[in-house]
Regions:
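Beta/coil-rich, acidic/histidine-enriched accessory regions frequently appended to metallopeptidases
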Residues: 77, 549-795
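Short, hydrophobic/aromatic-enriched beta-strand segments in well-ordered soluble domains
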Residues: 85-87, 91, 104-106, 179-193, ...
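Glycine/proline-rich low-complexity spacer/linker segments in large multi-domain proteins
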Residues: 112-126, 188-249, 253, 274, ...
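Hydrophobic helix-coil surface modules that form long, contiguous segments used
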Residues: 221-235, 241-440, 469
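Hydrophobic alpha-helical and helix-loop surface patches within well-folded domains
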Residues: 20, 32-53, 66, 320, ...
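Solvent-exposed beta-hairpin/edge-strand motifs
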Residues: 97-154, 262-263, 699-709, 727
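A surface-exposed beta-strand-loop module
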Residues: 25, 71, 80, 90, ...
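Early extracytoplasmic/domain-onset interaction patches
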Residues: 24-103, 525
Length: 795
């Protein structure tokens, strides 16, 4: 029992001693947030043989190809589209595929679609447009009707419709590494009235008082299309909910569109049977446009108005061919005038691109003046940043859709307005610049994502953000004072400090404040990256590298991030983390500026400086107001050495030490000690949390100024507060952060420091003294041996 008791006491003492030791060595850690930690291995996927670590396609990269042969008919009275397609699916993946997934995006307009049933509402009011839409769904329903699915031999195939997706089970799996299969599908759907139901396609009929009742039809997502099968996700079979757009494979198309005989058709690709659908005069004008310097009408406004006056009884079939495109869209109307202009690209080794616009009389004169010229301008600017435009046409169509893009064709909305009372035709400044801007934007989408084929349904910013950035560049090259809505750093501040933000890397259907998030913020981020972080030369080279690497391929965000870093040689993980993965904003405050002067090492000079600083101070208010004499003034016996000696006079000991210290300096150290420059120290505080370069404009007493660009790495050891130093022989009078408003700083009220700058003295730090036991023990060695010998001290 005694033994156990003693053992217990010993154990308790042992534990107590460990506890005391633990308390003694407990580590205290400073708060630290590493805004510069690497994304590689943390948030980015591991590189593979398909996508390498440099951001380029790997040596085993593959992608599928899907070819379509489609016959489609538009029934104008019923607004019904009926079609049949033969699909050839080429499987370049290493996987055998027993079934195919297709997109039925028109199924979004079924009453029981996931999109319709998952819509939410808020507030205590409702727009009349919402009321009209709700009423329309009571007696109308959209969506595909699939009437037949057969294989290449005509045998029926089993299929399943899952909301906006179609799964086709193949009789035999399509083999990987080059296998192919053929599928034939027949289908139909009712076109939506775009102004009532909304969406990216549909029809618009001119039925108001005084209008002719004719319609414009814009066809998009109008046929079952193959979903993407990729190396990083397999089948991209996410339902269409409206916001997240499209993820599609490249392929070759032949499309025959049967429409009323007096319609004019615009479509993806090149018209194959102009001799059957255009008059000889129209064909001649189309040929003239190839080398014209101004747009040429192919179908004149007079011809369009004549067609509007009567309804043809027959039909015509327009045949189009498009190679290596990811989608196909069309527009059809008897209201269309059509102008064209050949755009000759830099280098001159390619045929001209036919920039063409299709518009009703209600769009004139804005569209004749600006649409086709905006297309030509877009091709010039975007190609200078990326690659030559590879397709034969680029088209802009005016109709019910305000702005939407498809290969070689775009739908754009702005028009003039006619006064209901006077009939006068006018247009607003917003309509003018809105038309130019939307044409630039939608035609710009030919590059992103029609050619650099990103996954729109997953990452909105990859096409909308990149495209809006280039749109901003094109707008400023159209007119220096172009009223751009997105791209200027100052214009993103309101969003950056707003509530309910989500990171740019959020999946498209979950994005809040869609326009600001998917368009404006990434466009601004890229503007800042180009103008402030990387510089134009490095940025432009890296962006071009990305565009050319992923030309006609499927990039991911990580391919973009890696390419921008690998090409430029700049580590940008901090930038991607802040702008793309987070919701912090930019707000850097200049809290304090202090001038520091070097301690000269001369006691008399230092005394003189201290005396001068003291004399600048006001006397004690209390001492000044006291009227009676002090004890020291009335009693001489209280006055001693300290009363008689001048307060700042150096002592004899100080002078001796200074002389000794000076004698110990090397010539280089003595020159450094004699520097009379000012060391200005700036206290910077990161209020917003987003680390950014610090742009500092310094103004001096002689009227000169300079701008210092401090890289974002200044925050790498403390992301919240740092002190930065600037050495000059000039006198600083003013300091301002972000003088050109280039960083999207949210609070300019804390960016300026003016007025009196306090001066303090920097003491010269002595180098650390190294222990030398041999010297302290009065010993020495000789050059030829480690043997020690006596070395009596001379002290």
């Amino acid at each position: 029992m005694t033994t156990l008791f003693l053992r217990g006491c010993a154990a308790a003492l042992l534990l107590l001693s460990f506890g005391v030791q633990a308390d003694a060595i407990r580590q205290t850690k400073a708060p630290f947030e590493d805004k510069f930690r690497q994304l590689e291995g943390e948030d980015w996927p591991t590189p593979t043989d398909y996508r390498n670590a440099a951001g380029a396609p790997g040596y085993r990269y593959w992608q599928q190809q899907v070819d379509y042969d489609i016959q489609v008919r538009l029934d104008e009275p019923s607004k019904q589209v009926t079609g049949a397609e033969t699909v050839v699916y080429h499987n370049h993946s290493p996987d055998s595929l027993p079934y195919l997934w297709l997109l039925l995006d028109q199924n979004r307009f079924k009453r029981d679609s996931m999109d319709n049933l998952s819509r939410t509402v808020s507030g205590e009011s409702i727009s009349l447009g919402q009321v009209r839409r709700a009423k329309r769904y009571q007696d109308w329903e959209g969506g595909f009707t699939i009437t037949s699915v057969r294989d290449g031999n005509g045998r029926p195939l089993e299929f399943t419709v899952v909301d906006s997706l179609l799964r086709i089970d193949l009789a035999q799996p399509v083999a990987g590494n080059g296998g192919s299969t053929q599928v034939h599908i027949e289908w139909s759907f009712p076109m939506i009235e775009n102004k009532v139901v909304g969406g990216r396609s549909g029809y618009e009929c001119f039925t108001d008082k005084g209008q002719d009742g004719n319609c414009i039809f814009e066809g998009a997502q109008w046929f079952p299309r193959l979903a993407v099968y990729s190396d990083y996700e397999g089948w991209h079979n996410k339902a269409f909910l409206g916001s997240g757009e499209f993820t599609l494979e490249f392929g070759d198309y032949r499309v025959a569109l049967t429409v009323p005989a007096d319609h004019v058709v615009a479509a993806t690709g090149e018209l194959q049977n102009a001799d059957r659908v255009l008059s000889a005069a129209q064909r001649q004008r189309l040929a003239q446009a190839r080398d014209a310097t101004e747009p040429v009408f192919v179908v004149t406004p007079a011809e369009a108005e004549a067609a509007e006056g009567g309804r043809a009884s027959g039909e015509k079939t327009w045949v189009f061919k498009a190679d290596n495109v990811r989608d196909f869209a069309w527009a059809s109307s008897r209201k269309f005038a059509w102008d064209a202009l050949g755009v000759h690209q830099a280098g001159g080794d390619q045929p001209p691109v036919m920039a063409m616009s299709f518009f009703p009389k209600e769009a004139r004169p804005l569209w004749d003046a600006y649409s086709t010229k905006s297309i030509a301008h877009t091709l010039k600017v975007y190609s200078s940043f990326t690659f030559p435009y590879p397709y034969p046409t680029a088209q802009s169509v005016n109709g019910p859709v305000g702005g939407m893009e498809y290969p070689m064709i775009t739908f754009n909305g702005p028009r003039p307005v006619k006064d209901e009372k006077t009939g006068n035709l006018t247009y607003t400044e917003r309509a003018k610049y809105g038309l130019i801007g939307v044409v630039i934007h939608e035609v710009g989408h030919q590059y992103f994502p029609m050619i650099v084929n990103s996954d729109e349904r997953q990452w909105t910013w990859m096409d909308e953000g990149l495209n809006t950035f280039l749109q901003f560049q094109a707008e400023k090259q159209w007119d220096r004072d172009f009223p751009s809505r997105r791209g200027e750093p100052k214009d993103i501040v309101e969003y950056m400090v707003s509530q309910d933000q989500v990171p740019l890397m959020t999946q498209s259907d979950s994005v809040l404040q869609f326009g600001a998030n998917g368009y404006a913020k990434p466009a601004t981020a890229l503007t800042i990256l180009r103008e402030t972080v990387m510089g134009r030369e490095l940025f432009d080279r890296a962006l071009r590298e990305y565009a050319q690497r992923w030309y006609m391929k499927h990039p991911t965000p990580y391919d973009f991030f890696r390419t921008m870093e690998e090409s430029s040689g700049i580590d940008l993980d901090w930038f991607w983390r802040g702008w793309f993965y987070g919701t912090d904003h930019v707000d850097i405050a200049l809290d304090q500026v202090v001038r520091w002067r070097l301690d000269s090492g001369n006691p008399d000079a230092e005394a003189s400086w201290s005396r001068g600083e003291y004399q600048k101070e006001p006397p004690s208010l209390t001492a000044t107001r006291n009227t009676g004499k002090t004890v020291v003034e009335t009693d001489p016996a209280t006055r001693d050495y300290y009363d008689r000696a001048e307060r700042f006079a150096p002592t004899a000991s100080a002078r001796r030490k200074a002389k000794k210290d000076d004698a110990a300096l090397s010539p280089e150290e003595r020159r450094a000690r004699a520097v009379s420059d000012s060391f200005y120290r700036f206290d910077l505080r990161n209020v917003g949390g987003l680390v950014m370069p610090v742009i500092l404009k310094l103004t001096f007493s002689d009227g000169s100024d300079t701008v210092v660009r401090i890289p974002a790495e200044v925050w790498r050891k403390n992301a919240r507060q740092v002190t930065w130093e600037y050495v000059t022989d000039k006198t600083l009078t003013r300091a301002e952060l972000d003088p050109l408003w280039e960083t999207a700083d949210a609070d300019r009220g804390n960016n300026l420091f003016t007025g009196t700058i306090a001066t303090r003295t920097l003491k010269i730090a002595s180098p650390p003294k190294q222990d030398n036991r041999m010297r302290e023990d009065d010993l020495k060695v000789l050059p030829d041996s480690l043997q020690t010998y006596p070395a009596p001290s001379k002290d």
